[in-house]
Amino acid sequence: YYSIWDWFNPLWPEKDQPTYRGKPCNEVTLNNYIEKVMYPQFKELVLKYEPALIFSDGDWWMDDEKWQTKPLLAWLFNNAPNKDEVVINDRWGKVRKKHGGYYTTEYGSGFSDPSILWEENRGIGKSFGYNRFEQFDDYNSTELLIYMLCDIVSRGGNFLLDIGPTADGRIPVVMQDRLINMGKWLNVNGEAIFGTRRWKRDCQWSEGVIVEYTKQEFHKGIPDPIIEMARYPRKGQARKEC
Protein backbone atom coordinates (compact mmCIF):
# COMPACT_ATOMS: atom_id res chain seq x y z
CA TYR A 1 0.00 0.00 0.00
CA TYR A 2 1.32 3.41 -0.95
CA SER A 3 -0.59 6.70 -0.66
CA ILE A 4 0.68 9.28 -3.10
CA TRP A 5 -1.04 11.97 -1.02
CA ASP A 6 0.56 12.86 2.30
CA TRP A 7 -1.88 15.13 4.13
CA PHE A 8 0.56 16.29 6.79
CA ASN A 9 3.88 16.75 5.00
CA PRO A 10 5.36 20.22 5.70
CA LEU A 11 6.56 20.56 2.10
CA TRP A 12 2.93 20.52 0.93
CA PRO A 13 0.95 22.26 3.70
CA GLU A 14 -2.80 21.80 4.09
CA LYS A 15 -3.54 25.35 2.91
CA ASP A 16 -1.94 24.49 -0.45
CA GLN A 17 -3.89 21.26 -0.99
CA PRO A 18 -6.96 21.05 -3.28
CA THR A 19 -9.29 20.17 -0.39
CA TYR A 20 -8.61 23.38 1.53
CA ARG A 21 -11.67 25.66 1.50
CA GLY A 22 -12.34 25.07 -2.16
CA LYS A 23 -9.14 26.80 -3.26
CA PRO A 24 -7.10 25.54 -6.23
CA CYS A 25 -4.03 23.50 -5.46
CA ASN A 26 -0.74 25.38 -5.10
CA GLU A 27 1.26 23.70 -7.86
CA VAL A 28 4.57 25.18 -6.72
CA THR A 29 4.48 23.41 -3.36
CA LEU A 30 2.85 20.35 -4.97
CA ASN A 31 5.74 19.99 -7.42
CA ASN A 32 8.20 20.48 -4.59
CA TYR A 33 6.45 17.72 -2.62
CA ILE A 34 6.46 15.36 -5.62
CA GLU A 35 10.14 15.98 -6.36
CA LYS A 36 11.45 15.81 -2.79
CA VAL A 37 9.02 13.40 -1.10
CA MET A 38 6.77 11.33 -3.35
CA TYR A 39 9.28 10.27 -6.02
CA PRO A 40 12.19 9.49 -3.64
CA GLN A 41 9.94 7.73 -1.14
CA PHE A 42 8.27 5.57 -3.79
CA LYS A 43 11.60 4.60 -5.35
CA GLU A 44 13.12 3.83 -1.96
CA LEU A 45 10.28 1.43 -1.15
CA VAL A 46 10.57 -0.29 -4.53
CA LEU A 47 14.37 -0.61 -4.41
CA LYS A 48 14.43 -1.80 -0.81
CA TYR A 49 11.53 -4.27 -0.84
CA GLU A 50 10.93 -5.08 -4.54
CA PRO A 51 7.18 -5.58 -4.01
CA ALA A 52 5.26 -7.91 -6.28
CA LEU A 53 2.16 -5.74 -5.95
CA ILE A 54 1.71 -2.01 -5.35
CA PHE A 55 -1.68 -0.75 -4.21
CA SER A 56 -1.63 2.99 -4.82
CA ASP A 57 -4.18 5.28 -3.19
CA GLY A 58 -4.88 8.92 -2.37
CA ASP A 59 -5.21 10.09 -5.97
CA TRP A 60 -8.80 11.32 -5.81
CA TRP A 61 -8.61 15.09 -6.28
CA MET A 62 -6.14 15.43 -9.14
CA ASP A 63 -5.40 13.76 -12.46
CA ASP A 64 -2.27 11.85 -13.41
CA GLU A 65 -0.73 14.91 -15.08
CA LYS A 66 -0.74 16.92 -11.85
CA TRP A 67 0.38 13.92 -9.80
CA GLN A 68 3.11 13.25 -12.40
CA THR A 69 2.61 9.51 -12.05
CA LYS A 70 3.33 8.62 -15.69
CA PRO A 71 7.12 9.19 -15.39
CA LEU A 72 7.10 7.35 -12.07
CA LEU A 73 5.42 4.30 -13.56
CA ALA A 74 7.69 4.48 -16.61
CA TRP A 75 10.63 4.17 -14.21
CA LEU A 76 8.92 1.29 -12.41
CA PHE A 77 8.31 -0.78 -15.53
CA ASN A 78 11.59 0.02 -17.28
CA ASN A 79 14.26 0.40 -14.61
CA ALA A 80 13.07 -1.05 -11.31
CA PRO A 81 14.57 -4.41 -10.21
CA ASN A 82 11.06 -5.92 -9.97
CA LYS A 83 9.90 -4.51 -13.32
CA ASP A 84 9.10 -7.94 -14.79
CA GLU A 85 6.79 -9.10 -12.02
CA VAL A 86 5.31 -6.05 -10.29
CA VAL A 87 1.55 -5.50 -10.58
CA ILE A 88 -0.18 -2.17 -9.96
CA ASN A 89 -3.78 -1.11 -9.44
CA ASP A 90 -5.65 1.75 -11.11
CA ARG A 91 -5.29 4.60 -8.57
CA TRP A 92 -2.72 6.95 -10.05
CA GLY A 93 -4.69 10.13 -10.72
CA LYS A 94 -8.30 9.80 -11.88
CA VAL A 95 -7.61 6.75 -14.04
CA ARG A 96 -9.73 4.25 -12.12
CA LYS A 97 -11.40 1.69 -14.36
CA LYS A 98 -9.23 2.98 -17.24
CA HIS A 99 -5.58 2.07 -16.63
CA GLY A 100 -3.80 -0.37 -14.32
CA GLY A 101 -2.82 -3.99 -13.95
CA TYR A 102 -6.20 -4.55 -12.34
CA TYR A 103 -9.20 -2.37 -11.59
CA THR A 104 -10.63 -1.64 -8.15
CA THR A 105 -14.03 -0.92 -6.67
CA GLU A 106 -14.58 0.29 -3.11
CA TYR A 107 -17.69 -0.66 -1.16
CA GLY A 108 -19.09 -1.50 -4.57
CA SER A 109 -20.18 -4.48 -6.60
CA GLY A 110 -17.18 -5.16 -8.82
CA PHE A 111 -17.39 -5.92 -12.53
CA SER A 112 -19.30 -8.39 -14.67
CA ASP A 113 -17.05 -8.13 -17.75
CA PRO A 114 -14.97 -11.36 -17.81
CA SER A 115 -12.10 -9.60 -19.62
CA ILE A 116 -11.41 -7.29 -16.63
CA LEU A 117 -9.10 -8.22 -13.76
CA TRP A 118 -10.58 -6.61 -10.67
CA GLU A 119 -10.68 -6.40 -6.90
CA GLU A 120 -13.36 -5.24 -4.49
CA ASN A 121 -11.99 -3.36 -1.46
CA ARG A 122 -13.93 -2.70 1.73
CA GLY A 123 -13.72 -2.67 5.47
CA ILE A 124 -15.49 -5.06 7.81
CA GLY A 125 -17.46 -2.03 8.98
CA LYS A 126 -18.01 1.28 7.23
CA SER A 127 -14.48 2.58 7.80
CA PHE A 128 -11.04 1.51 6.58
CA GLY A 129 -9.19 2.72 9.64
CA TYR A 130 -10.13 2.23 13.28
CA ASN A 131 -13.32 4.17 14.04
CA ARG A 132 -14.30 4.29 17.71
CA PHE A 133 -17.71 5.70 16.80
CA GLU A 134 -18.76 2.61 14.85
CA GLN A 135 -21.48 0.59 16.52
CA PHE A 136 -21.78 -3.20 16.53
CA ASP A 137 -24.52 -3.01 13.90
CA ASP A 138 -22.13 -1.16 11.58
CA TYR A 139 -20.08 -4.33 11.10
CA ASN A 140 -21.00 -6.97 8.55
CA SER A 141 -21.79 -10.41 9.90
CA THR A 142 -19.54 -13.39 9.16
CA GLU A 143 -22.34 -14.89 7.07
CA LEU A 144 -22.59 -11.81 4.88
CA LEU A 145 -18.80 -11.49 4.49
CA ILE A 146 -18.66 -15.11 3.32
CA TYR A 147 -21.45 -14.39 0.88
CA MET A 148 -19.48 -11.41 -0.45
CA LEU A 149 -16.37 -13.57 -0.83
CA CYS A 150 -18.25 -16.26 -2.76
CA ASP A 151 -20.03 -13.74 -4.96
CA ILE A 152 -16.86 -11.82 -5.81
CA VAL A 153 -14.74 -14.92 -6.50
CA SER A 154 -17.51 -16.49 -8.60
CA ARG A 155 -17.38 -13.42 -10.85
CA GLY A 156 -13.60 -13.57 -11.21
CA GLY A 157 -12.71 -10.90 -8.66
CA ASN A 158 -10.40 -10.68 -5.67
CA PHE A 159 -11.71 -9.68 -2.24
CA LEU A 160 -9.54 -7.28 -0.23
CA LEU A 161 -11.03 -7.09 3.26
CA ASP A 162 -9.60 -4.31 5.40
CA ILE A 163 -9.20 -4.22 9.17
CA GLY A 164 -8.57 -1.13 11.29
CA PRO A 165 -6.13 -1.65 14.18
CA THR A 166 -6.25 0.67 17.18
CA ALA A 167 -3.51 3.24 17.85
CA ASP A 168 -1.49 0.66 19.81
CA GLY A 169 -1.82 -2.02 17.12
CA ARG A 170 -4.65 -4.12 18.54
CA ILE A 171 -7.25 -5.65 16.23
CA PRO A 172 -10.75 -4.95 17.64
CA VAL A 173 -12.47 -8.05 19.00
CA VAL A 174 -15.38 -7.83 16.55
CA MET A 175 -12.92 -7.87 13.64
CA GLN A 176 -11.02 -10.79 15.16
CA ASP A 177 -14.30 -12.68 15.39
CA ARG A 178 -15.10 -12.13 11.70
CA LEU A 179 -11.61 -13.12 10.54
CA ILE A 180 -11.44 -16.23 12.72
CA ASN A 181 -14.86 -17.47 11.62
CA MET A 182 -14.16 -16.76 7.96
CA GLY A 183 -10.93 -18.73 8.40
CA LYS A 184 -12.85 -21.66 9.88
CA TRP A 185 -15.21 -21.61 6.92
CA LEU A 186 -12.28 -21.52 4.48
CA ASN A 187 -10.62 -24.46 6.23
CA VAL A 188 -13.64 -26.52 5.21
CA ASN A 189 -14.60 -24.89 1.91
CA GLY A 190 -11.35 -23.33 0.68
CA GLU A 191 -11.09 -25.58 -2.36
CA ALA A 192 -14.18 -23.81 -3.73
CA ILE A 193 -12.36 -20.46 -3.45
CA PHE A 194 -8.59 -20.79 -3.91
CA GLY A 195 -7.25 -21.54 -7.37
CA THR A 196 -10.69 -21.34 -8.97
CA ARG A 197 -11.80 -19.35 -12.01
CA ARG A 198 -15.02 -17.66 -12.93
CA TRP A 199 -17.64 -19.40 -15.02
CA LYS A 200 -18.42 -18.13 -18.52
CA ARG A 201 -21.35 -16.14 -17.14
CA ASP A 202 -22.68 -15.05 -13.77
CA CYS A 203 -25.13 -17.25 -11.90
CA GLN A 204 -27.70 -15.94 -9.45
CA TRP A 205 -30.37 -17.47 -7.25
CA SER A 206 -32.08 -14.09 -6.98
CA GLU A 207 -32.60 -11.24 -9.41
CA GLY A 208 -28.92 -10.32 -8.96
CA VAL A 209 -29.39 -6.75 -10.12
CA ILE A 210 -26.26 -4.64 -9.62
CA VAL A 211 -27.15 -1.06 -8.72
CA GLU A 212 -24.50 1.66 -8.87
CA TYR A 213 -24.94 4.32 -6.20
CA THR A 214 -23.31 7.73 -6.13
CA LYS A 215 -20.74 8.61 -3.46
CA GLN A 216 -23.25 11.00 -1.91
CA GLU A 217 -25.94 8.30 -1.71
CA PHE A 218 -23.52 5.85 -0.11
CA HIS A 219 -22.46 8.28 2.62
CA LYS A 220 -26.12 9.00 3.37
CA GLY A 221 -26.66 5.33 4.19
CA ILE A 222 -27.99 3.89 0.93
CA PRO A 223 -27.89 0.06 1.22
CA ASP A 224 -24.73 -1.71 0.17
CA PRO A 225 -25.14 -3.07 -3.40
CA ILE A 226 -23.75 -6.49 -2.51
CA ILE A 227 -26.07 -6.69 0.51
CA GLU A 228 -28.98 -5.90 -1.79
CA MET A 229 -27.91 -8.70 -4.12
CA ALA A 230 -27.75 -11.10 -1.19
CA ARG A 231 -31.47 -10.96 -0.46
CA TYR A 232 -33.30 -14.23 -0.94
CA PRO A 233 -35.87 -14.24 -3.74
CA ARG A 234 -39.56 -14.09 -3.06
CA LYS A 235 -41.34 -17.40 -2.92
CA GLY A 236 -41.65 -18.92 -6.37
CA GLN A 237 -39.44 -16.33 -8.05
CA ALA A 238 -36.02 -17.96 -7.76
CA ARG A 239 -34.23 -18.70 -10.99
CA LYS A 240 -30.80 -19.99 -11.89
CA GLU A 241 -29.14 -17.92 -14.60
CA CYS A 242 -26.45 -20.18 -16.04
Regions found by a protein language model. Give the residues of each.
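Mature catalytic domains of secreted/periplasmic carbohydrate-active enzymes
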Residues: 1-242
